[in-house]
Amino acid sequence: MASFVPTKQFVGASSSSDIGSSRLVSLQLPSKFSSSNFHLPSRPSQLKRLEIQAAGSTFGNYFRVTTFGESHGGGVGCIIDGCPPRLPLSESDMQVELDRRRPGQSRITTPRKETDTCKISSGTADGLTTGSPIKVEVPNTDQRGNDYSEMSLAYRPSHADATYDFKYGVRSVQGGGRSSARETIGRVAAGAVAKKILKLYSGAEVLAYVSQVHQVVLPEDLIDHQNVTLEQIESNIVRCPDPEYAEKMIAAIDAVRVRGDSVGGVVTCIVRNLPRGLGTPVFDKLEAELAKACMSLPATKGFEFGSGFAGTFMTGSEHNDEFYMDEHGRIRTRTNRSGGIQGGISNGEVINMRIGFKPTSTISRKQQTVTRDKHETELIARGRHDPCVVPRAVPMVEAMVALVLVDQLMAQYSQCMMFPINPELQEPLQSSPESAEVTL
């Protein structure tokens, strides 16, 4: 029995006169799937074409973001669907965030030189969003595909080279394709829009910083989450708000960089002034959505929320956040070991989380590996790569957190704000003072 699928030329696929044609080609199943023991549902009507759709490139439910492009292709970007109309928006709103993510910023990042200049090609008119999909494009201008000639055959240890082949049977060799951190440009651009919506609508602020590089760990009590500023975070190349520990982290990265090696670390992210009530019980808890979003970033290997694993060493009486009434008559908690979320729903306190990143897998040291044709070999990877990803991961984490929160804000508004709220228990998702200053 034969099945029929439309075919398309892929990089690395076997050449054939049939490839690239618009007609259907027949794929013969192995003999063990003979017609005697393998049956497809019969269709009395004409044969229908099997549709194969790419998966995993779209994020969100109400505020939906699809990223596209590859590390050494023509460019990368995103399409944002579901952005509210009449939001003031220009390329400069996104560029400031893309510049924080941009490669080649310092000696502790990849030396690849890209301006990462973005262009909005749809979804805005006269400086305002129109409610239609917003397309953002960033060209690639500093590709060096020849750096990856050896890696077209030999798999980089702990990289996605092998697993992409295991899944698809074909992959983009140069720069890792979609598995490259360059894919995150689209996320950061969309995250800039999400951060602006959060700030204008509810006054919420998302900030992230580096809290660990290799064995250099910033003590939590050194940073006041209520008052830490973006200026403090951006005051050094490692994006640690404490100058003393920033120097120690930079030294740790320099030590492995000169040896052609790499290290990992931790990014801490906080959210201030987030409305209460975001998130839903059971399967779509707010911390679960945040964990999924952050763990979708390249090189992530761990996620902690609130007290995290340290909470497992406490008793209930030590861990519980006791309630009290503040001077404004609001219910608050005296401590914040819950990390601003209880029962999967935001409680109005500062949200805090930590995301662990592994050492960069592409290093210029000799490693044992195998080739695509299953021969053992040695590999010294070429190319330009970060000795530590965490300084540039800071805006990526902020972007993913902001995307989750805007999506949850829209969900809360549509589900729980349609009818009059219970003023004794619920708070309106009222606009921040900044939104009142926007002239439409």
Curated annotation (Swiss-Prot):
Keyword ATP-binding: no
Segments of skewed composition (Polar residues): 118-132
Tissues where this protein is expressed: Predominantly expressed in flowers and roots and, to a lesser extent, in stems, leaves, and cotyledons.
Positions of the UniProt region annotated as Disordered: 100-147
Subcellular location: Plastid, Chloroplast
Lipoprotein recorded as keyword: no
CDD domains registered for this protein in UniProt: Chorismate_synthase
Known EC number: 4.2.3.5
Catalytic activity annotation: 5-O-(1-carboxyvinyl)-3-phosphoshikimate = chorismate + phosphate
Keywords, ordered alphabetically: Amino-acid biosynthesis, Aromatic amino acid biosynthesis, Chloroplast, Lyase, Plastid, Transit peptide
Any Pfam family: Chorismate_synt
Needed co-factor(s): FMNH2
GO CC aspect terms: chloroplast; cytosol
InterPro entries in the cross-refs: Chorismate_synth (IPR000453), Chorismate_synth_AroC_sf (IPR035904), Chorismate_synthase_CS (IPR020541)
Record-level GO BP terms: amino acid biosynthetic process; aromatic amino acid family biosynthetic process; chorismate biosynthetic process
Class of enzymatic activity (EC top level): lyase
GO MF terms, alphabetically ordered: chorismate synthase activity; FMN binding
Transit peptide (residue range): 1-54
Pathway entry: Metabolic intermediate biosynthesis; chorismate biosynthesis; chorismate from D-erythrose 4-phosphate and phosphoenolpyruvate: step 7/7
Assembly with partners or alone: Homotetramer.
NCBIfam families tied to this protein: aroC, PRK05382.1
Described function: Catalyzes the last common step of the biosynthesis of aromatic amino acids, produced via the shikimic acid pathway.
Family: Belongs to the chorismate synthase family.
Protein name: Chorismate synthase 1, chloroplastic
Organism this protein belongs to: Solanum lycopersicum
Lineage, broadest ranks: Eukaryota, Viridiplantae, Streptophyta, Embryophyta, Tracheophyta
Record gene name: CS1
